Amino acid sequence: MQSVLSLSFSQASLPLANRTLCSSNAAPSTPRNLRFCGLRREAFCFSPSKQLTSCRFHIQSRRIEVSAAASSSAGNGAPSKSFDYDLIIIGAGVGGHGAALHAVEKGLKTAIIEGDVVGGTCVNRGCVPSKALLAVSGRMRELQNEHHMKAFGLQVSAAGYDRQGVADHASNLATKIRNNLTNSMKALGVDILTGFGAVLGPQKVKYGDNIITGKDIIIATGSVPFVPKGIEVDGKTVITSDHALKLESVPDWIAIVGSGYIGLEFSDVYTALGSEVTFIEALDQLMPGFDPEISKLAQRVLINTRKIDYHTGVFASKITPAKDGKPVLIELIDAKTKEPKDTLEVDAALIATGRAPFTNGLGLENINVTTQRGFIPVDERMRVIDGNGKLVPHLYCIGDANGKLMLAHAASAQGISVVEQVTGRDHVLNHLSIPAACFTHPEISMVGLTEPQAREKAEKEGFKVSIAKTSFKANTKALAENEGEGLAKMIYRPDNGEILGVHIFGLHAADLIHEASNAIALGTRIQDIKLAVHAHPTLSEVVDELFKAAKVDSPASVTAQSVKVTV
């Protein structure tokens, strides 16, 4: 990529109501401890060193009570004295939406300000429409694979597509999800305020010609496509992901600048629809953000077998849109020496060099906050730090705007964590427990550290690292689907069973990663989780076999406990 920034165009609901779960002999260790995406277990009255003797969960009407009175979620609450709102959120993307809903559930009078459309990048120009396009590309790819169909005994005539119909599928899905988000906030009484929000001063926000006050403020303004200097975007032949998701054309030959999540996903879409793709990558290898072993396998499957070529170790120093019958012109230079390398003439170019924070015009100068490469500096609790290194009281920043982890679900988790804090619970989010996924066919997913990162950490801290692997070729369900190409890899500590990272390439990898991410979030050790039972035959057995393949010195720390369930 030409930028270090990258983004993947990427909450569990409660179970059935009126069920009571009781346990009088809970184990003293962690497997049953509940924690949201790496939030501290202390928030749920659990202690890793004390036995749970009388913890009762009563689930009714989508409400949880854990040794405390639950806050009312029936409508927006009354604000604190002297403030218009308890919480003001600037930005109604996925992060702002998650924070708003959680705030109302906690009884906070909440307002959310949006100057564009509800849903932000993820819903309107990212995760949601891209998944619609990828759903199409996946089906096209399968129908076009005569060998794959023949293995099932199926005969399929030549597959085709209607470009506008595909584009409409993506647009309609974005509209549906956007309406769902809007309606969910309205139903809970969140005040949705229209206008561009800016901080006027401590606990004071302006939107349009209006000024409101809030006890606490969250900035959740997200990001925009990053376009390097020298690249002219016309929205037709030189485009960003914002334009590509509209699928206004399917060029015969398109260059994709950057081979991260965004570039890989669009290469999957374009090649399935008939385009030839050329990757332009600044680093010496494709897919630099992934674990090297996974990258190597993914390149063999996702790139080498398709109509894709690539240039690595080069910058696109200048890109000129097509005009007057001339093609798109791309001038390449060596990434290290900056010497001219090559010139490409293509039908279109997609700039997939990552995302840049959208933080201009937020009034940060009014509170002495200086951005760092556009990102708003925050501490581990998402509290904003001013130019003097001091915390700005009652001001938080979540999501892409703070740059900690540019993923939609990370923004939502950060927003929920902040709401927990402003309602009296100290929460620190473990970002290493947050998974990421690339929705190619097959998919790539990961959580925690890559092998090089883990070995660097081990060398500094003085412990050993081991690797466990398992292949999809040994999984019955994958073979039944004729999708045996895949690998799961775990990096761990053999001395204590700590999971440092898990990386998966294969069928439904994006779904399979969550068992590992939850284990990291909960602090569950391999010697405990390897005793879990998985249904057969399922893809989840890939992860099961991965845990079982690990060799850990420490014995399991738990024994089976009987749990009485009353329905």
UniProtKB/Swiss-Prot annotation:
<dbReference type="InterPro" id="IPR001100">
    <property type="entry name" value="Pyr_nuc-diS_OxRdtase"/>
</dbReference>
<dbReference type="GO" id="GO:0046685">
    <property type="term" value="P:response to arsenic-containing substance"/>
</dbReference>
<dbReference type="InterPro" id="IPR023753">
    <property type="entry name" value="FAD/NAD-binding_dom"/>
</dbReference>
<dbReference type="Pfam" id="PF02852">
    <property type="entry name" value="Pyr_redox_dim"/>
</dbReference>
<dbReference type="InterPro" id="IPR004099">
    <property type="entry name" value="Pyr_nucl-diS_OxRdtase_dimer"/>
</dbReference>
<feature type="binding site">
    <location>
        <position position="281"/>
    </location>
    <ligand>
        <name>NAD(+)</name>
    </ligand>
</feature>
<keyword id="KW-0560">Oxidoreductase</keyword>
<dbReference type="GO" id="GO:0004148">
    <property type="term" value="F:dihydrolipoyl dehydrogenase (NADH) activity"/>
</dbReference>
<keyword id="KW-0274">FAD</keyword>
<feature type="binding site">
    <location>
        <begin position="258"/>
        <end position="265"/>
    </location>
    <ligand>
        <name>NAD(+)</name>
    </ligand>
</feature>
<feature type="transit peptide" description="Chloroplast">
    <location>
        <begin position="1"/>
        <end position="67"/>
    </location>
</feature>
<feature type="disulfide bond" description="Redox-active">
    <location>
        <begin position="122"/>
        <end position="127"/>
    </location>
</feature>
<feature type="binding site">
    <location>
        <begin position="114"/>
        <end position="122"/>
    </location>
    <ligand>
        <name>FAD</name>
    </ligand>
</feature>
<dbReference type="Pfam" id="PF07992">
    <property type="entry name" value="Pyr_redox_2"/>
</dbReference>
<feature type="binding site">
    <location>
        <position position="131"/>
    </location>
    <ligand>
        <name>FAD</name>
    </ligand>
</feature>
<dbReference type="GO" id="GO:0009941">
    <property type="term" value="C:chloroplast envelope"/>
</dbReference>
<keyword id="KW-0676">Redox-active center</keyword>
<dbReference type="InterPro" id="IPR016156">
    <property type="entry name" value="FAD/NAD-linked_Rdtase_dimer_sf"/>
</dbReference>
<dbReference type="GO" id="GO:0009570">
    <property type="term" value="C:chloroplast stroma"/>
</dbReference>
<dbReference type="InterPro" id="IPR012999">
    <property type="entry name" value="Pyr_OxRdtase_I_AS"/>
</dbReference>
<keyword id="KW-0520">NAD</keyword>
<keyword id="KW-0809">Transit peptide</keyword>
<dbReference type="InterPro" id="IPR036188">
    <property type="entry name" value="FAD/NAD-bd_sf"/>
</dbReference>
<dbReference type="InterPro" id="IPR050151">
    <property type="entry name" value="Class-I_Pyr_Nuc-Dis_Oxidored"/>
</dbReference>
<feature type="binding site">
    <location>
        <position position="400"/>
    </location>
    <ligand>
        <name>FAD</name>
    </ligand>
</feature>
<comment type="subunit">
    <text>Homodimer. Part of the plastidial pyruvate dehydrogenase complex (PDC) containing multiple copies of three enzymatic components: pyruvate dehydrogenase (E1), dihydrolipoamide acetyltransferase (E2) and lipoamide dehydrogenase (E3).</text>
</comment>
<feature type="binding site">
    <location>
        <position position="354"/>
    </location>
    <ligand>
        <name>NAD(+)</name>
    </ligand>
</feature>
<keyword id="KW-0285">Flavoprotein</keyword>
<feature type="binding site">
    <location>
        <begin position="406"/>
        <end position="409"/>
    </location>
    <ligand>
        <name>FAD</name>
    </ligand>
</feature>
<feature type="active site" description="Proton acceptor">
    <location>
        <position position="536"/>
    </location>
</feature>
<comment type="function">
    <text>Lipoamide dehydrogenase is a component of the plastidial pyruvate dehydrogenase complex (PDC).</text>
</comment>
<feature type="binding site">
    <location>
        <position position="197"/>
    </location>
    <ligand>
        <name>FAD</name>
    </ligand>
</feature>
<feature type="binding site">
    <location>
        <begin position="221"/>
        <end position="223"/>
    </location>
    <ligand>
        <name>FAD</name>
    </ligand>
</feature>
<dbReference type="GO" id="GO:0009507">
    <property type="term" value="C:chloroplast"/>
</dbReference>
<comment type="similarity">
    <text>Belongs to the class-I pyridine nucleotide-disulfide oxidoreductase family.</text>
</comment>
<keyword id="KW-1015">Disulfide bond</keyword>
<protein>
    <recommendedName>
        <fullName>Dihydrolipoyl dehydrogenase 2, chloroplastic</fullName>
        <ecNumber>1.8.1.4</ecNumber>
    </recommendedName>
</protein>
<keyword id="KW-0934">Plastid</keyword>
<dbReference type="GO" id="GO:0005829">
    <property type="term" value="C:cytosol"/>
</dbReference>
<keyword id="KW-0150">Chloroplast</keyword>
